[in-house]
A protein has these predicted regions:
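Terminal signal-anchor or tail-anchor transmembrane helices
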Residues: 2-25
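Intrinsically disordered, low-complexity sequence elements enriched in Ser/Thr/Gly/Pro
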Residues: 1-4, 28, 77, 125
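Arginine residue identity/basic-tract feature
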Residues: 3, 24-30, 62-63, 72, ...
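A transmembrane-helix-recognition feature enriched in membrane-embedded lipid enzymes
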Residues: 21-87, 138-139
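Soluble catalytic domains of membrane acyltransferases
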Residues: 80-160
Length: 160
């Protein structure tokens, strides 16, 4: 098993290096490299969320801060990758009163801008299938996310 893991790691590292070198000339290679880095950033942010979720679950009322930490860490990791600056107008209002933010995830940009503006003590509402996505699902369960069954209207309304 150890040799298999070592072999896969070596192939992965060499492939990543070749893709990095090729990305200087090829737009397609640059796209694949950025996609891989985006997935790594998401996994890293979710892993941070799992650790923070475990720690903050020991402190009553602090569990919802995990969403803030993960959202901001994802924004921190992704911003230099895509070179996009997000300016939030009226950000001071998010600190004073409740708000609803909607991201329909038509692109990865939604996650980036939500990561920039996500307030402290917030929860995430998501479809129940996300519970089983590695890293992401564990972080979401630990952070107190509300999972809805989109196929059952009554259940979705009850969750809200």
């Amino acid at each position: 098993m150890g040799k298999l893991v070592h072999g896969v790691s070596t192939v992965g590292a060499v492939s990543f290096l070749l893709l990095t070198l090729a990305s200087r000339r090829s737009q397609r290679a640059r796209f694949y490299l950025n996609s891989i880095l985006c997935v790594i950033s998401m996994a890293l942010s979710s892993s941070i969320g799992v650790v923070c979720g475990l720690v903050l679950s020991l402190f009553p009322g602090k569990r919802f801060n995990v969403n803030y930490i993960v959202a901001r860490s994802f924004h921190f990791f992704m911003k230099p990758l895509i070179g996009m600056y997000v300016e939030v107008e009226g950000e001071e209002h998010l600190k004073r009163r409740p708000a609803i933010m909607v991201g329909n995830h038509q692109s990865s940009i939604d996650t980036l801008y939500l990561g920039r503006m996500f307030p402290v003590n917030s929860i995430i509402m998501a479809k129940k299938e996300l519970k089983w996505v590695p890293f992401l699902g564990q972080f979401m369960m630990l952070s107190g996310s509300a999972f809805i069954d989109r196929k059952s209207r009554a259940s979705a309304i009850k969750t809200m």
